[in-house]
Amino acid sequence: MNKTSLSILFLAPLTVAGAAIAASRHAERVEALPPVKVQMPIVGDTALAPHRFSDVQLLEGASRRHVKTTRSQIETTDTAGYFKLSKPASGRVVETLVTTLRPERFIKGSLKVTSASVFEVMVDGVSKGSKAKPDSAVTASSVVAVPIELEPERTADIMVKVLTDSEAKNDPAVKIEFEPESKYSDVNYSLVPEKKHRFSIYDMSDGPRARSTSMSPDGKYVITRFVEVFSEKEQRTWSTLTETKTGKIINASLNGSAGWMPSGSTLYYTVKRGDSYDLVNISLPSQSSETVATGLPTGDIIWSPDASYFVYYKYVPGTRKEGIMQRYSSPDDRMPENRDRYYLMKYDLSTSVAQPLTYGGATTYPDGFNADGSKMLIKAMRENTSEYPFYKTDLIQVDMKTMAVDTLVKANGDLSSAVYSPDGKSLFIVGGPSLFGKLGVNAGDHPIANDFDSQGYLFDIASKKVTPMTRDFDPAIQGEPVWNASDGKIYFRAEEGFFVPVYCLNPADGSIKKLPVAADNVANFSIGNREDRYMSYTGQAYEYAGRAYLMDLKTGKSTVMADPDAERLAEVNFGKTQPWKFTASDGTEIDGMMCLPPDFDPNKKYPLIVYYYGGTSPSQRGMSHAYIPQLFASRDYVVYILNPS
């Protein structure tokens, strides 16, 4: 799109195809689901007369909100606006009519359903009103009015369930109409049985997603972990187990807490039993389970490479701030849990003895083991209010046999992570550009480098020599890297404008290669630490979220392992997204992305929203945040997202 074509974006009156100027208007078409026969229950106690079973209760069990059928058909009304339904030859039948209501602007009004038959009205899957008794003819009592309030371009799913009776005196019929309040009489709206709805905040927050994957150390199997959100308070989680060679799911209901033992392809999980935990191993491919240890002090385990011991956190509550006057030792001390601490414990499986590894001072974090488990990295960060960047980080190497410690790094700022090389002689450290003075800084004339521009450094343990590996590499490293023991290369995610791909760094020559991942925004990835054939990952874009992939690293081909939200999102009418760059007055090229409204008409003008995140990280392609452009575009805005970072 060039600069001239951008003129279509300025504010002008809006219209929606198929919408009409608002007034009381009846639905002319609905989707009719296949009829379902129902029967009265066996009634055995007349003492319940005050709570006698009513006809409308037959409709309550026929929700049908999620019915999936190819047999539904579109029904049209007669000249009076009624949908004529068939009277059953015998007994009673539930007829279900479905439509949608969508306004261009905010609207209030009443959904009115009229029928002499018994019926129930549902809006967005929730019962909003019903008529409990049949009439011999349509009267004033045959009308049920449901108040409706809708945001602009918000779709309301309407379902009317009608109980038809072979013994009824009249032929069943139903009328569905919407009457706006007088102050909203100029708002356009549609009342049609659309197959697709426009994107809503619930499409962003709800639904099933693959949230992470975990590959076995030998690369033969992948755990995929899922979450499905139903509401703010309701969700479910589950896991599956997939064989990488065949792509076959060999366990569709894997224990949700299952993880990998440090080598091979043995699964483990813990079971709480009283005040302690049992350790259960699952052998593959047989999937037979065995309890291999009991009496463990925790279920949250960080395994050593040889599985002879594990490390876990011990929580130590800090002193509580009480009284009306508070003395804060630092800005961070304003946070309620700032004085709480988490220290590290070591549990030896052969002796069943738990030994403290750290205690006192700042909270300590484990940062991984060398290949044989004889050494461990521990990180501690503390506040330093007297000088920028206001935090200091110590990286300490611990000899797990003698408890001797060696402080490898005393850094200014946040040292995000560190990982051992396969031979244990080097580390790959991720942190800000100023972590080691000016070694990682590439900020031109700016006096302070962007701390969010995370860099990668090679650190030689014996000599303490630091080599910046990504100073001239534009993307910023994200998350924890993986130093693969099979090919000797380092894998990491990186922010690259709107995208978050995965890169592979060869520490021998410093070359960096982008992997051809299929997702625009990779949320996480997993590689077996002793193989280099497969990589699993999850990702999202503007039109999908929570997909799980398996990549063959030899061919670069990715296959979709799971896309649980595909069916639900197929019912969403997304707006088209396209890149749009321009050159600023100082000559800087500004990267940008444009999202057009669904059903965009290039001959019309639209209001424009420019979204510019003022932080130091770029905006990313995805639909799992509150400022997703699809949400604004669904309200008939053109959305332009700047990425000047």
Predicted regions and their residues:
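Accessory carbohydrate-binding/adhesion or oligomerization-edge regions at the termini
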Residues: 23-83, 100, 159-198
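Serine-hydrolase catalytic core recognition
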Residues: 524-645
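Blade-terminus and WD-like Trp-Asp/Gly-His loop motifs, strongest in beta-propeller folds
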Residues: 213-221, 257-267, 301-309, 367-376, ...
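Beta-strand-rich ligand-recognition modules
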Residues: 106, 123-173
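A flexible loop/linker signature enriched in serine peptidases of the S9 family
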Residues: 207, 226-238, 251-252, 270-280, ...
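Aromatic-lined ligand-binding clefts that engage carbohydrates, nucleic acids, or primary amines
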Residues: 103, 108-121, 158
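A short helix->beta-strand "capping" segment at the edge of beta-propeller domains
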Residues: 191-208, 354-356
